């Protein structure tokens, strides 16, 4: 993926959790998380979309998408959610399975993204 012009914006630690939460994390903030990977994927990508919009960007501005998952159960369905989110847009992507995310043990997915806006 080659991007020219615009402003590079980095997004890190995007999960299905509420975008504004306490640090250090409070367990009760994660009580409403769905327990399946596809649903958390949808919520995390919606949070990413809101963050993109906050800086004047869109999904089409994403040039790199990095995904960490704590389970591969539901991976195919999560991939379908990602394809729905991206539409015809194809940024560079990578997906890795990890033992646990630092946010909360109930978080199953975390996304980092790089976008070139403008």
Residues of each region from the PLM?
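Short, polar/acidic, helix-capping and beta-turn segments at strand->helix junctions
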Residues: 1-118
């Amino acid at each position: 993926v080659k991007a020219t012009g615009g402003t590079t914006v980095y997004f890190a630690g995007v999960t299905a959790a509420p975008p504004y939460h306490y640090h250090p994390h409070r367990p009760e903030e994660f009580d409403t998380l769905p327990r399946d990977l596809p649903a958390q994927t949808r919520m995390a990508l919606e949070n990413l979309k809101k963050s993109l919009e906050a800086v004047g960007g869109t999904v089409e501005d994403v040039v790199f998408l990095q995904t960490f998952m704590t389970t591969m159960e539901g991976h195919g369905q999560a991939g379908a959610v990602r394809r729905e989110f991206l539409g015809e847009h194809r940024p560079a992507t990578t997906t890795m399975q990890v033992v646990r995310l630092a946010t909360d043990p109930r978080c199953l997915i975390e996304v980092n993204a790089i976008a070139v806006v403008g």
